[in-house]
Structure formats: structure tokens, C-alpha cells
Design a protein with these regions (language model features):
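Short, solvent-exposed loop/turn motifs
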Residues: 31-33, 64, 116, 205
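Phosphate/dinucleotide-binding and metal-coordinating scaffold of catalytic cores
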Residues: 77-368
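Cleaved targeting-peptide boundary
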Residues: 20-25
Length: 371
């Protein structure tokens, strides 16, 4: 737990634009404490074989203090300078955390203090809910909020919905940030951005979160025509309304026949077919069948075609290279499940593009210790 506190403190400081004003307090279990101003760097060194377990704090003048981890009782960081989100439920002001289903929507009042880094968000009514799959069952809950109109938040493109990622099993709080930075560096279309923020829920500080776009078809994320294109997800959670399994051996689609030994779990992630299909003069099931057949044809080509030239008729090769480069360099274990494997297509006449990349909780030599 002590290591987690220290890593969290280090990330809070590194994520701040006002590091020269940091006040970092280390309270020792012998009732003494150390106070550091102008903290520039925190390093953590541990050797299980030798029992070495130390933290080093370096200030702006280059002075370094070494602290025994076992002597630390608690750590407090003041004035991190990162944006602060304040969310107060109007239907359950006494709750200390969201309960029930992640899809339960609650009316709330949200405001954001940009702390001089970004424009503030004035108080406004939002819809607040949970998100995530396995992460929803963890102690530090991930959230999602939706505003009445598209709004720019922390420099991100205007959108109605945004996600607050808890990063509970990432004791560095940096895995998703590093991977998404790499995706943007490679200029992958529609790659998510992220901003470290502090979240208060009904007045209770929930710690540091990662603000990012809600992945989906829309101007703030996968910006394609929702009446022509489609966003797919291959994910073993297999929990969307429109889904099918692709048999890797017979090269056929099997409705609701997902089996992790021989099939791929394919789902329509966005848009909502029940809303889009009627505008096209189709039922949702008819429109789903059209895209299911198209996606299956692409998978069959990938599984059976030896020629890269022929595959260009089905997939965008550059997007494939960048997708696997990000996941390989980050050593993302989610690919093995598979989970969060997203692909999109502008229209039925186009080609499939891999991305946007998502979910790097189990990456970069992961250590699943909570934050």
C-alpha cells in the first residue's frame, strides 16, 4: 500500500503544470514528518532479494532525500494543479459511491475547476452513471457523464459524453496515458486523449482519474457518418445487443455461438441499430445481417488469403501495423482474451481500419496493485 501511495504522489506531481509550487508531506510512523517544497522528481527503488525499499525525493535545487518506505505512515500532496471535477447526485446526495448496475443513470450537478490549466466548466445538469466491465466491480469505480449539449472539456473535441477512468489496478496511473500518447504520436485516427483530473463524488474525494473521450461513433471520437459506417468490437465480454461469433475453423458466422476455443466474439459497438436502421428503410435485424456478412467476409479473407495485396481490398494495412505496434510495444495482455479490440469502417464500400486502441490496464509489465 505504501508503494501505491508513493507512486500516486509521483504521478500527481508529474501530471501537474505547477510543479514549482508543490508541497509534498511525508508523515512517518514515528510521529515525525518531512515536508518538501518545489519537488521535481520522485523515484522508487525496491529489491526484494536484498530487502532494499527506498524512496528518493529531489527538489528544484537538486537536493535529494532518501526515505525508508517502512517508516512511512501516509503521504499528502497539496496543490497538484490538475483539474478538479465535482459531481453531486441530485437523487442520492447521501451516497458515498455509485451502487447497482453500471447502466443506472442518475441526475447530477457537475462543475469543473480547471485550476488555470483549462477553462472551467460552470455548474450544469448532467446524467451520471458507471462504466467498464470487470473494473466496475472494483473498489474505485469508473464513471461516465453526459451533458445536454456538445461541450469542449479540457481541450478535447466537443462532445456530450466523456469517461472518467479509475485506473484502479494500475499503481502507476500511467499505462493508458502512455499507450494513448503513442497512438496519437503515430497519428492513428480517432485516438483517445487523456487528462489527469481529481474527482469529488458527493463531496468525497475519490482520487485521481483519467478524463478521456467516450469511444463511439460521433464527432468527439470515431468521426464517421453513423448512417453509413460502423464500429465493431471483438471482446470476450460479449455483452452488446447485436453480436455474433465467427468460427475460425469453418469461417462462418454463428449467431450467439461464442466459444472461446474456436470462435471470435464480434459485436456492434456503435451506432444503435434500432435508431439508424429505420432511417434506411430497414429493420435493425436486417441491417445487422448486412454488416455481419460484410465483417465475416473480411475475417474469411484474413484467415484464408496469403497475399497482402489481396487483403488491401478488405483492411487498411497501415492501421493494422499501427494497431499492433501500440499493443506490442505496451505488451498489452488484453489482446489474448480478446478484449477491447475495435475496428471501424466508413461505409460498406470502404475497408476496415483497426482502432481506436483502448484499454491498457494489463500492459507494460502490469502489477495489479490498487491505487
Amino acid at each position: 500500500m505504501k508503494k501505491i501511495l508513493l507512486l500516486t504522489a509521483a504521478v500527481l506531481i508529474s501530471g501537474s503544470a505547477m510543479a514549482q509550487h508543490e508541497h509534498f508531506h511525508v508523515f512517518r510512523n514515528d510521529k515525525q514528518f518531512n515536508t518538501f517544497n518545489n519537488v521535481q522528481e520522485i523515484t522508487y527503488q525496491r529489491s526484494p532479494s536484498s530487502g532494499y525499499n527506498k524512496m528518493q525525493v529531489t527538489d528544484a535545487k537538486g537536493n535529494t532525500t532518501t526515505i525508508d518506505i517502512e517508516a512511512i505512515d501516509s503521504v499528502v500532496v497539496r496543490s497538484t494543479g490538475i483539474p478538479e471535477f465535482h459531481v453531486n447526485l441530485t437523487d442520492h446526495p447521501d451516497w458515498t459511491e455509485l451502487t447497482g448496475s453500471k447502466s443506472d443513470e442518475h441526475p447530477a450537478i457537475l462543475r469543473m475547476d480547471g485550476n488555470g490549466m483549462y477553462d472551467d466548466l460552470p455548474e450544469q445538469e448532467v446524467t451520471f452513471r458507471g462504466r467498464g466491465n470487470s473494473t466496475w466491480n472494483m473498489k474505485k469505480k469508473p464513471y461516465r457523464f453526459k451533458m445536454d449539449k456538445k461541450t469542449e472539456v479540457c481541450g478535447m473535441k466537443k462532445a456530450k459524453s466523456f469517461a472518467l477512468i479509475a485506473n484502479y489496478i494500475d499503481c502507476s496511473l500511467m499505462r493508458n496515458t502512455v499507450a494513448l500518447w503513442l497512438a496519437n504520436y503515430l497519428e492513428m485516427p480517432f485516438a483517445n486523449h487523456c487528462v489527469p483530473v481529481k474527482v469529488y463524488f458527493n463531496g468525497i474525494c475519490k482520487g485521481q482519474y483519467m478524463l478521456t473521450e467516450k469511444t463511439g461513433v460521433g464527432s468527439g471520437s470515431v468521426d464517421i457518418d453513423e448512417e453509413k459506417g460502423m464500429l465493431f468490437e471483438i471482446d470476450s465480454n460479449y455483452d452488446e445487443d447485436y453480436k455474433f461469433a465467427y468460427d475460425l475453423y469453418s469461417h462462418t458466422a454463428v449467431q450467439n455461438g461464442y466459444n472461446n476455443t474456436r470462435t471470435l466474439p464480434v459485436m456492434i459497438s456503435d451506432p444503435d441499430l434500432t435508431e439508424i436502421a429505420p432511417a434506411l428503410g430497414l429493420t435493425a435485424d436486417e441491417y445487422f445481417d448486412t454488416w455481419k456478412n460484410d465483417f465475416s467476409a473480411m475475417l474469411t479473407a484474413v484467415m484464408t488469403t496469403p497475399s497482402t495485396g489481396s487483403l488491401k481490398e478488405y483492411i487498411d494495412i497501415e492501421s493494422v501495423v499501427n494497431f499492433f505496434m501500440v499493443n506490442s510495444l505496451s505488451s498489452n495482455h488484453e489482446m489474448r482474451h480478446p478484449k477491447s479490440f475495435k475496428l471501424y469502417k466508413d461505409s460498406l464500400d470502404g475497408v476496415y481500419k483497426f482502432g481506436p486502441v483502448w484499454d491498457f490496464d494489463l500492459s507494460l509489465i502490469h502489477i495489479s496493485e490498487p491505487t
